[in-house]
């Protein structure tokens, strides 16, 4: 990994881009658009004008993760059956590795057990200390911030999430009205994502509160343990209900209209472009000042490039790295839309039925960044989505080639420095504007001429 000089507290203007896409029933034209990269240099990139996603070019939307193994712990001494590995997904290039389940431990430790290290679940959350997140809880815990999790549904009864999950919405038409029911081929995914954002742990006999930390002493504690989760369920990877073309815009609009300040989308597609039906919803979120964080995608799931919604201008796209801060071969992908990278391997999270799951994927990296954004929103409540995005990218530790690159984006996220930056003097989202993109590109679509019968 090559490091370059870091630039802090200065406006960074991200690439203005559009996804490359060719559809059988459409043709596209290419227009040159000037984009500024950094505050002191400009670059001209030729940006492909993209046509609407054709009906014959199916977009597959799925969670971005690889389940490794069910963890042996549960709040009940008997692990829940729902914590078993999920079935193989349609887009998985190879079967997900089975991993090795960790040795089963008692849910009730002996009296006098250490109260400083927490239980085995908590100890596995290496990112909390290694990235300085625990030190930020004296300044912010996410209290008063609502984060929408647009995913497979969230189990609000899990002890590590109980009380932090609001009554949400089902955008699919086949789930529970409140968004609490797991749906699709990976029904546990949304619960895992939510726990990394706003898990608060739970009480277990023999453990007492950890000094200086919010929440309970055992189980998963999220980056923003006092934030509220607004669950919005989608049906992905299985048939039934509404189409993804309908589900996504409905989900985004519901999140915005029901108080979400940040939206997490740990889901991705096999296309860099997106249906035109999504445009207005993402523009609406932009206009209302809601920050959207999305996972980049995983090579291990057969994705070789970032796919929508992570390619949409203005979305803060998160790639994955391993514990050595190297881009993960299987748990990340590449693309010019990546903004920052965060841990995505050897993760542990809460799973429905009072269980836990060991997993990897950019699905796990995104909620860590979302959680930090929630801390920043509490600490700086008057800052806009553009300013929050600026904090996160300007404070990142440059990695890979100097400057922004398609593997690390602006670099490895740095929660402590993001919190410490002076208020960014930016008015526009440094990652682009979907509203501007629509104005430039959607109006210039040209249909393929119909061949003459003559």
What does each model-found stretch correspond to?
Residues 146-149, 195, 228-233, 256, ...:
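Structural recognition of the beta-strand scaffold that forms the well-ordered cores
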Residues 34, 56, 65-144, 159-160:
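Protease zymogen maturation seam
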Residues 108-226:
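Active-site core segment of subtilase-fold serine proteases
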Residues 232-308, 355-359:
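Substrate-binding/access-modulating region of protease and related hydrolase catalytic domains
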Residues 381-453:
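C-terminal subdomain of the subtilisin-like protease fold in secreted/lumenal serine endopeptidases
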Residues 2-77:
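Secretory targeting and sorting signals
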Residues 295-313, 319-337, 349-360, 401-407:
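Active-site-adjacent substrate-recognition loops and nearby beta-strands
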Residues 344-412:
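Hydrolase catalytic cores
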């Amino acid at each position: 990994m090559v490091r370059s000089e870091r630039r802090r507290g200065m406006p960074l203007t991200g690439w203005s881009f559009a996804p490359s896409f060719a559809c059988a029933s459409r043709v596209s034209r290419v227009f040159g658009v000037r984009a500024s990269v950094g505050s002191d240099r400009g670059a001209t990139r030729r940006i492909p004008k993209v046509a609407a996603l054709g009906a014959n070019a199916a977009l597959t939307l799925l969670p971005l993760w690889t389940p490794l193994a069910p963890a042996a712990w549960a709040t009940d001494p008997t692990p829940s059956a729902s914590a078993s590995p999920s079935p193989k997904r349609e887009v998985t290039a190879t079967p997900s590795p089975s991993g090795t389940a960790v040795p089963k431990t008692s849910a009730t430790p002996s009296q006098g057990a250490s109260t400083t290290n927490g239980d085995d679940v908590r100890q596995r959350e290496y990112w909390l200390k290694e990235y300085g997140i625990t030190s930020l809880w004296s300044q912010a815990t996410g209290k008063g911030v609502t984060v929408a999790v647009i995913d497979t549904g969230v189990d609000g009864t899990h002890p590590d999430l109980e009380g932090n999950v609001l009554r949400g919405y089902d955008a699919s038409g086949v789930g529970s009205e409140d968004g609490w029911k797991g749906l699709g081929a990976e029904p546990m995914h949304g619960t895992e994502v939510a726990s990394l954002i706003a898990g608060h742990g739970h009480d277990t006999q023999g453990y007492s509160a950890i000094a200086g930390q919010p929440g309970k002493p055992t189980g998963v504690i999220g980056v923003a343990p006092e934030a509220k989760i607004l669950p919005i369920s989608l049906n992905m990877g299985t048939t039934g209900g509404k189409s993804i073309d309908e589900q996504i815009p409905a989900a985004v609009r519901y999140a915005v209209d029901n108080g979400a300040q940040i939206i997490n989308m740990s889901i991705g597609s096999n296309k860099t472009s997106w249906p035109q039906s999504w445009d207005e919803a993402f523009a609406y979120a932009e206009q209302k000042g809601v920050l959207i964080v999305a996972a980049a995608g995983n090579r291990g799931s057969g994705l070789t490039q970032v796919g929508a919604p992570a390619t949409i201008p203005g979305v803060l796209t998160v790639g994955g790295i391993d514990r050595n801060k190297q881009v993960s071969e299987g748990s990340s992908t590449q693309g010019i839309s990546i903004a920052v990278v965060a841990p995505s391997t050897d993760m542990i999270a809460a799973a429905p039925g009072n269980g836990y799951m060991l997993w990897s994927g950019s699905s796990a990296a995104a909620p860590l960044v979302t959680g930090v954004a929630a801390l920043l929103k509490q600490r700086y409540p008057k800052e806009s989505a553009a300013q929050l995005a600026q904090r996160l990218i300007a404070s990142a530790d440059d990695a890979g080639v100097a400057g922004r690159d398609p593997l690390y984006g602006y670099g490895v996220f740095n929660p402590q420095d993001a919190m410490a930056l002076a208020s960014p003097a930016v008015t526009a989202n440094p990652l682009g504007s979907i509203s501007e993109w629509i104005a430039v590109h959607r109006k210039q679509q040209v249909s393929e001429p119909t061949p003459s019968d003559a």
